[in-house]
Amino acid sequence: MAERIQKLLSQWGIASRRHAEEMILAGRVSVNGKVANLGDKADPQQDFLSVDGKQIKADNRPRDIYLLVNKPRDVLSTCDDPRGRKTVLDLLPQDLQRGKGLHPVGRLDRNSTGALLLTNDGELTLRLTHPRYHLPKTYDVWLEGNPSDEDLEKWRSGMMLDGKKTLPATLEVISENKDQIHLLVTLTEGRNRQIRRLAEELGLTVLKLHRRTIGPLQLHTRGKVLGSGQFRFLSPAEIRLLKKQVNLR
């Protein structure tokens, strides 16, 4: 299957996608003997892809890797940052940070914590981030203030965001007092900063946001707790379940 060249180079562990774009612009990448342009696509099973004159073969692709990370606060959900801030790849050992093509699937904003999937499986990433597949994700949300029952029902039923109504959500009140409330929120879509923006629409402030689960993936499983900043490899059963939810074998 033909894919954008910068994506292939990232999946092959040659460079991050941003660096791969720079390599293409610098004329260092060729497809079938011709210098590639940004936006070009290639099929590694059919095309000859070269970097600095060295051919990249289809069987050079690293094995598929699937990791679950418990992202701490103040860590970016990206592969690299031009300002030198800490990213989720910095949480991994050196042998996983480079050369494997790992990237986060979706994002948690800088101030949010919790479950984040990292993989180099491009097809799985594409499906998990496609609006067609409504993979449920569950969050602990601490809010300043006390929303009314009517506000919570609005959130559950769906609210307008960027001119489009959000999908229904599940909200469970865990605890509350006169100053704040702790909710368990399950979403089946992933719009940019969705929980924080919906809270703002209701006049509420998010004090803390922590993602517990991504589909079948849980931070706490098999009697073990994945601590902040730690990661683990997914089990074969978890990989199968995750792929099944997006119709991928």
Swiss-Prot record:
It catalyses: a uridine in RNA = a pseudouridine in RNA. Keywords: Isomerase, RNA-binding. GO terms for biological process: enzyme-directed rRNA pseudouridine synthesis. InterPro entries: PsdUridine_s_RsuA/RluB/E/F_cat, PsdUridine_synth_cat_dom_sf, PsdUridine_synth_RsuA/RluA, PsdUridine_synth_RsuA/RluB/E/F, PsdUridine_synth_RsuA/RluB_CS, RsuA_PseudoU_synthase, S4_RNA-bd, S4_RNA-bd_sf. Residues 3-70 form the S4 RNA-binding domain. The keyword RNA-binding applies. PROSITE patterns: PSI_RSU (PS01149), S4 (PS50889). The active site is at D109. It is an enzyme of class 5 (isomerase). It comes from the Bacteria. GO terms for molecular function: RNA binding; rRNA pseudouridine synthase activity. Its EC number is 5.4.99.-. Belongs to the pseudouridine synthase RsuA family. This is Uncharacterized RNA pseudouridine synthase slr0361. It comes from Synechocystis sp. (strain ATCC 27184 / PCC 6803 / Kazusa).
